[in-house]
Amino acid sequence: MLQPMWVLSDSDLATIHSATVELLKSTGIQFLSEESIELFRHHGFRVEGETVFFTEEDIDSALKLCPPSFTIHARNPERSVEIGGRRPIFSPIYGAPYVVDFEGNIRSGTLEDYQTLVRLAHQLPNQDMVGYLLCDPGDVPAGKAHVHMLHASMTCSDKPFMGSSTHGSRGVEDCMRMGEIFFDSSRAYLREHPFCISLINSLTPLRYEKGSCEALMAFARDRQPLLIASRVTGGATGPITMAGVLVLQNAEILAGIVLAQLVSPGTPVVYGCASGIMDMRSIVVSLGAPEFSKILRAGVQLGHHYGLPCRGGGSLTESCDIDAQAGFESMSTMLNAMAYGADFIQHSAGCLSSYLAASFSKLVMDDGICSYGKAMREKVDFSEEALAIDIIKEVGHGGEYLTHLHTAMNCRSAVWQPAYSYRGGLNAWEASGKPDIREAIRERGKQLLAEYVQPDLEPRIRERLEAFVLAYKA
């Protein structure tokens, strides 16, 4: 594995941390939850109304309790993932209200669309997880959408998934109860074997809303890992300067981490870098901008400075179609996240139009970008076989390697192969009708769905999950 490419000096890190401490100490963070406020007050924090103030000692004490890595357990143990380990973990798009299907039709998401996205994520070889809220299934009641999405994650894939942090403490309890059914286990077992990681977003600037506080505290009590994130938009919800964005983001994330550790010391957390800037002409969040990658790079370095695994994103773009813009922006943001050492890459595949749309084709395309990035991160093999000194001597001056046994024995493993990119040359491409990569991606996706086989799940567990969803009262 290649070492991360750092951008901040030790002096820069100290400056950001010092400014963050000053902000938390003098201005504080609002928690719009009486339960959270009472917990802070119980532990001796300075509280004024809904605003909590933090000292550097409060921050340091919480950070010391956070594990540097942890495992998310899948029902199929071979699918379990370590976050904070030696490689990034990929989880697809999150939170899209719209869907773009293989034919290019744009519509509000449905439960069937959601299930299709989960099946695609299950089939794609580089997606480690199947996420949560891949699209908003608008054809089911909002109050029970989370149980339908969890049911899809549990029954359409055997990869690990994310938890339901969108419905406050009730959504957490539903997630845990479904987890007990799915793993055929007790709550105590799940606390020792975490099965989901859940996104907790601050309400920037300098706030956590009630539902997020409830979900954070409930998941922490059950020892489920938390992805505590801040999504500052420079020029809109935060300063337009990169340094200002980093300070505001850092303050919000650290405050959430402190709350998690007060609830349950040792709760696994991920430092969630999700901030960017607004294009002031279009008033659109600019995910493909170089500023987004610079903020991500610095944020990941800062999180690692604190000893925490870090989130980065992903295959991101403002483009509304599978076009050149989508390709170069998604490749840039993904490879930057991987080069900077992000441990958990959310929105790793499927994003169009600045988080607004989950695209079936984009999910397939971006999985190829994930594969490309993984190949770039691999160290060069300097084994005796790879050095091939004897082969070079044998072939000698002016020889060729195309027909040599060494080439035949190693050609499949030594060179990365794309799943859908064209490599046939100009004349062959013209002779074959000038095939379009977008069509190749669509056909690849349709093939994956045609080959999909639902993972085995004991009938009694499947029946209990279905009964839970059917009986659920929104």
Residue ranges of predicted features:
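Helix-rich catalytic cores of soluble enzyme domains
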Residues: 109-339, 343
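N-terminal glycine-rich anion-binding loops that anchor highly charged ligand groups
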Residues: 11-16, 28-43, 48-50, 88-91, ...
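Glycine-rich phosphate-binding active-site loops on the catalytic face of alpha/beta enzymes
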Residues: 335-357
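Catalytic-core signal marking the mid-to-C-terminal active-site face
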Residues: 4-19, 27, 32-41, 361-474
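Flexible, glycine/charged-enriched surface loops at secondary-structure junctions
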Residues: 30-37, 48-50, 128, 189-192, ...
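Glycine-rich, N-terminal phosphate-binding loop and its surrounding beta-alpha-beta segment
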Residues: 38-105
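Short beta-alpha connecting loops at secondary-structure transitions
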Residues: 2-5, 282-287, 315-320, 350-362
